[in-house]
Amino acid sequence: DFQPAGDLFSAYETSVEKTYAGILAKREKRREYGFENFGDDTFEWGYGPSYTYWSNSEYDHHHGFLLQFLRSGDGRWWELGEQQARHYRDIVVPHAGAPSRRGGPVHHNATSLWMPQHPEQFWIADHTIAGSSCSHSWAEGMVDYWYLTGDPWAGEVVREMADWYCDRIENNAFGAGGQERGPGWALIAVSALAGAVPSPRLMRAGQTIADWIIAWQDPLRGVVSVPISEQPSY
């Protein structure tokens, strides 16, 4: 049985309701439907010109949706979480190709064919055009979905992702030398995967990232100082 959500944090609960309504309203307005699209969502971003992107579950939306379902027992969040988890499982994560690609979630991708100001709007199925990188990939939501459903295909994807992360980390391709988000997101993902499918290889991968962060973290400011002049918004 679920413990009903109380009213102690009313401001938070109000924001949750607004978020749910906003997700559905945007889905309807932008027609975020279709065999390859449903479950994903869109956002705008850019330096100067702003483009519309398929997020490919940027920042692990289904992880948040499923946690909200668990804390509230509200089935609406289960529906959203399952929809996005299945999209991540079937579309975002490649299941064939070289080790550098197979199991590596594809990050967000822009299309100039749909923008809010365009009079004629349509989508193209471009979820798989971009590449994969540890700075734009997440694993906790897929682990959540596997644990909550026992779905064998989700479990297979979790194992594929574990192999991909280990391959990237063993080849020093986890974002070392760049912004904190590469090593940071990779360590979060590897930690979740190590809890789901524990292995010495995953533990070594996590230790590799942790060692790099400790070695390069600024002892006073607590950040990793790297030049990112090509990205002025940072």
Segments (PLM) and residue ranges:
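Catalytic cores of extracellular degradative/oxidative enzymes
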Residues: 1-234
